[in-house]
């Protein structure tokens, strides 16, 4: 019994092993894990199911084909594996490479690294540039010293918390938001987590930090930084920080960079009164009030925000460097009190009045390019300026800059402005207003459209319309020691409005369009039975207008809607058989040959199978749709003649109709057989099923002759005995007489003509009587037979 139980248990074990594809794995609840092994030689492509990995392993294992089998011993020989850039999607099978110490699977398409979970001999892993999200399988690889996983999809790095031997950890460009696992990795020498980190609590114990750079994450909560009180410099650029309240306690900070975050409220900064260098560029700041008390500030960067009001800066008189570029500034009057400024950026704003800088006499560098400044007279007193960048404005007169003799760097290039539009005419003339530092007019360098210059005017002779004319200027200028080219373009718009008229079958709409512009295409007109082709410059023919490329000329234009006529199908259906014609809208159909149908007369073509309207091929026109016309017929009526021995009656019956059966005709000595299509023989007409053909017919009454009684001998008729045993005296039956032969059951009428026969109205049930020339002969023969019979009977009796 025990032996049988052992065999049974052994069978179950074998079944489990087979079900597990020949692999026995013992995980021991996550401790003392053993790498997987294969128990029998197995084809490579069954172990490594990814085709690309199988090909790589074929080479590593020295095989010729991925279907070749390998043993666990073969797999144990592999210690390093370089498999980068092979398009590998799965590393299934790696769990059998028990002796791996180094692997490189970078630049593949991996998502699942589960097969690594028990490869505890690994010391270095490179799997950057994949699609890995779950790194749980790395949790027990405590021998790892190097781990590179940048450019993946990792969100949870908790499995790394026990990898205390790590000295290199690269996790940038992932989606990590929790770095708590890093708090115990005290041996780390190289760390990057430029990902989506929001929680900085794991940094709480790093109290010796004096400079911290957490750039390029998604940090929004920086409360843990309040514990890093030794911080003197904090660089937290390119994150998602919106609340900087925790920084209020970091009073030792003298440098703070929060460039590239989501800051709107900077109220906390009011307490950081030791700040000397503050970078708040590239945020969403509009209210600068909290900065009003940071009087130690010497350098303030506020570029690329949403600032339109800089009045809170008016009291920061210690400022030497101020950056206000790329904001929404129009009014810069508050800076007029910042008399210690030596460096000021105002470029890429909407400033047209630069006069508030006139009191900043310590300014050495001033940048206000890409604004709308046209008058620079307020700069005349800034004699300490050595760098002036004023390009891309609307400056036309350099005279106020003549006394800025300390300038060494100068930018006045690419001035550009557009004059107010003037109406187009053949001769256009405008004054030149561009002056150099001496006040002399700068002659145009180029003049568009063949224009000419006679100081002080530029003139154009324009035989045809152009939407604008322009001229350029370019002249080297020297101010102080700064030399540059004062250049720019002056554009003079020429306004020209013309009418575009759109015609649709006599209806007109008009749009005003400036010459040189694209026309807005009207809604496509609709015309029954037609397809819109486009807008053309003629009612027929002409050139089609292209609304994507054709521009309004310098004259009124007329555009006509042109259509192509649609074709439709007319289907003619005749008892399920169809033919068709293709006919243009409103065209006449060609009438088909009238169809024929046995027993019917063709009525015409109708728009319904029954009823409907008849199509008139002379006047009815093709509608804007496909149609079906149906052949309709009326049944013909034919005559059926009933012939009874030359006497006839008739019926009129529709084709395929049933005839009304006449009363059966009678004929003396005959029994009526029926109506036949021949006088003799032929086919009997069945009034219940036979239907009227497509022609007149004649049906003939056919009869069968009744049997005749034998004649009597000597003119006497022996008595007959009826069934009751009584005798009946014989009666003479004279042919042609008005008598009855009761023994035969036949009756004869004295009437020998059928002129009055009406088979439908007769009230008699008997056949009509007729004359019969053979009756006398039959009677005599009958009498002779009776006489002979009686004689023989008598003789027989005598012989007895």
From Swiss-Prot:
It is found in: Secreted, Cell wall. Residues 711-753 have a biased composition (Low complexity). Keywords: Cell wall, Leucine-rich repeat, Peptidoglycan-anchor, Repeat, Secreted, Signal. Pfam families: Flg_new, Gram_pos_anchor, Internalin_N, LRR_4, LRR_adjacent. Gene3D superfamilies: 2.60.40.1220, Listeria-Bacteroides repeat domain, Ribonuclease Inhibitor. The keyword Secreted applies. The modification Pentaglycyl murein peptidoglycan amidated threonine is found at residue 770. Residues 771-800 form a propeptide. It comes from the Bacteria. Residues 518-706 are annotated as: 3 X approximate tandem repeats, type B. NCBIfam families: internalin_A, List_Bact_rpt, LPXTG_anchor. Belongs to the internalin family. This is Internalin A. It comes from Listeria monocytogenes serotype 1/2a (strain 10403S). The gene is inlA.
